[in-house]
């Protein structure tokens, strides 16, 4: 598959470990390569390169918004940096 978003995700150098992604249900699910544990979910939002960033909520048992006041919508590059540095994404890994 030649999905440019998946290629960008898999090329991203994350200090916590390599990521791989798959396209699922109108978005992308990111996994840690070492454990295959889910790390984050990116859902397209608005302009071509904007994504809502979601994390797996152990309390709600579903993907949830990361922002304190609602959705976090950023470019793919900003989303990957956000995921790399925020601990909430790495709880299950």
Task: Specify the residue positions occupied by each region the protein language model found.
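Negatively charged, low-complexity tracts enriched in Asp/Glu with abundant Ser/Thr
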Residues: 1-35
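Intrinsically disordered, low-complexity regions
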Residues: 18, 28, 47, 68-71
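Mixed-charge, Lys/Arg-enriched low-complexity segments
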Residues: 1-9, 55-93
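Generic structural motif recognizing short loop/turn segments at the entrances and edges of beta-strands
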Residues: 17-19, 26, 49-51, 85-88
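Short, conserved beta-strand/beta-arch hydrophobic-aromatic motifs that form part
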Residues: 32-55
């Amino acid at each position: 598959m030649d999905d440019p978003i998946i290629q960008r995700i898999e090329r991203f150098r994350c200090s916590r470990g390599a990521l791989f992604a798959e396209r699922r249900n109108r978005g992308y699910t990111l996994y840690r390569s070492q454990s295959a544990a889910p790390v984050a979910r990116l859902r397209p939002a608005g302009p071509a390169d904007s994504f809502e960033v979601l994390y797996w909520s152990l309390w709600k048992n579903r993907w949830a918004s990361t922002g304190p006041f609602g959705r976090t919508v950023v470019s793919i590059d900003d989303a990957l940096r956000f995921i790399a540095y925020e601990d909430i994404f790495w709880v299950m890994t």
